[in-house]
């Protein structure tokens, strides 16, 4: 969640949003120029969805005129040529100019909305401090998240590292569909008060839950280790070192993995940083040890890697994947390093980082987060595909979707919550599932579940209907 406390505003002509230092070019790695760390010329505004009450880091918008521009000071260790990607939103055909001290690159937007757009050619930078600018060459409605620069001398090596990092996603492509549950210490029973932490974890019936999942024919289960609060249902020491009392003695994750694996289902862990201040009651001082800062992420990365490495080593091949939410909290970050931590104990583990409505934040991941992706295929292409998204903001990743089947939200975190009926008719479910099957996209149906492990009978019946479509029985 966004640690910046600025309100949404435009910057006066020629005025910096903040006196940010020059950006240092990273050797053999990605260098990111953030739009909210640029000098802004014009009436552009920083967008914050919730008025900066959270810690999400969004983008700069209200970019409409050719006389508006972004400017960064970039320090290069030597003369070089750079490949440039833009994380940008607009309309197809709109032309953008990226200028350095020696040359300019002109690129035309390809997608309607957000995209990760590779600029043609290479941007030349001189040794020392360079002025890099971005502007539109025609009036349009545009948004900018960032520019990503890679030294062309390093690009082949980085591409090889990406190729070596990626895991085989065939099992996910062939799984057809799975279940997702945002269930944890934030939950409530159908009626009455919730249990204190970790009583709901201690009382959870793993075998009954796994039997229910098996009835649906699901190929995998996405289980939320954290979400509305940060209480982890396993004895992870790295978490206790940062936030004492936020883990527990029962290894619910390990038991779930064993029970699901025994029934032919894989386990994917959904992980959220848990910075929901109003709900969780964790002070910013308490989380300061986790180091969530937009401009110095070393402490955060160390904490993230120590936690995910311990989890990964503990469960090994039992843990098939990670679904890491709210990438807007930590992008830009050393996602290659974080990815290696996420794959600790199982090099074939699949990982995904959420980029909200924006394009992929890193190539060091395996599948598309796909939040709310129940209506489209996000560039997966025509029927008969292999599941890999061919074009657009998630290009190169395995197609994946997670969406609410019933609701009213992703999980139950308030007393007396009533589960809605499934939001789809059987005809709609049939069309949705067949579209995904024909393109090998993995569909993840999110069901609400009460504290005792019970779900809506209507939702369960709908999932059994999905089983008949996909499994034929």
Whereabouts are the PLM-identified features?
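Mature catalytic domains of secreted/periplasmic carbohydrate-active enzymes
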Residues: 2-473
């Amino acid at each position: 969640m966004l640690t910046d406390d600025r309100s949404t505003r435009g910057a006066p002509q020629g005025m910096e949003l903040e006196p940010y230092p020059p950006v240092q070019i990273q050797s053999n790695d990605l260098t990111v120029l953030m739009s909210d760390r640029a000098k802004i010329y014009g009436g552009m505004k920083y967008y914050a969805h919730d008025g900066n009450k959270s810690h999400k880091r969004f983008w700069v918008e209200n970019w409409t005129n050719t006389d508006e521009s972004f400017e960064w000071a970039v320090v290069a260790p030597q003369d070089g040529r750079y490949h440039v990607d833009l994380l940008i939103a607009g309309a197809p055909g709109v032309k953008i100019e990226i200028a350095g001290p020696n040359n300019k690159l002109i690129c035309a937007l390809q997608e309607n909305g957000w995209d990760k757009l590779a600029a043609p050619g290479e941007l030349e930078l001189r040794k020392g401090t360079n002025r890099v600018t971005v502007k539109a060459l025609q009036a349009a409605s545009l948004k900018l998240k960032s520019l990503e620069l890679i030294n062309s001398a390093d690009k082949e090596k980085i591409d090889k590292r990406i190729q070596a990092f990626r895991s085989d996603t065939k099992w996910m492509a062939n799984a057809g569909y799975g279940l997702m549950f945002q269930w944890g210490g934030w939950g409530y029973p159908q009626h009455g008060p919730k249990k204190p932490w970790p009583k709901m974890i201690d009382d959870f019936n793993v075998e009954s839950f796994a039997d229910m999942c098996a009835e649906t024919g699901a190929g995998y289960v996405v289980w939320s280790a954290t979400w509305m609060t940060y209480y982890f249902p396993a004895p992870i020491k790295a978490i206790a070192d940062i936030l004492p009392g936020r883990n527990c003695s029962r290894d619910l994750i390990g038991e779930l993995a064993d029970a699901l694996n025994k029934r032919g289902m894989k386990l994917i862990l959904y992980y959220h940083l848990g910075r929901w201040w109003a709900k969780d009651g964790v002070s910013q001082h308490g989380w300061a040890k986790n180091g969530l800062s937009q401009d110095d992420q070393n402490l955060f990365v160390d904490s993230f890697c120590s936690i995910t490495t311990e989890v990964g080593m503990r469960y090994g091949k039992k843990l098939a994947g990670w679904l890491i939410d709210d990438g807007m909290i930590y992008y830009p970050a050393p996602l290659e390093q974080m990815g290696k931590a996420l794959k600790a104990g199982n090099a074939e583990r699949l990982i995904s980082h959420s980029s909200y409505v924006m394009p992929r934040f890193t190539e060091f991941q395996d599948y598309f987060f796909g939040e709310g992706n129940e209506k489209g295929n996000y560039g997966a292409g025509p029927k008969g595909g292999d599941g890999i998204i061919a074009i657009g903001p998630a290009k190169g990743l395995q197609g994946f979707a997670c969406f609410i089947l019933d609701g009213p939200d992703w999980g139950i975190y308030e007393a007396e919550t009533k589960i809605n009926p499934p939001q789809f008719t059987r005809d709609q479910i049939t069309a949705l599932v067949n579209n995904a099957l024909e393109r090998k996209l993995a569909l993840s149906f999110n069901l609400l579940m009460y504290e005792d492990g019970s779900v809506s009978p209507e939702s369960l019946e709908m999932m059994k209907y999905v089983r008949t479509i996909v499994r034929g029985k």
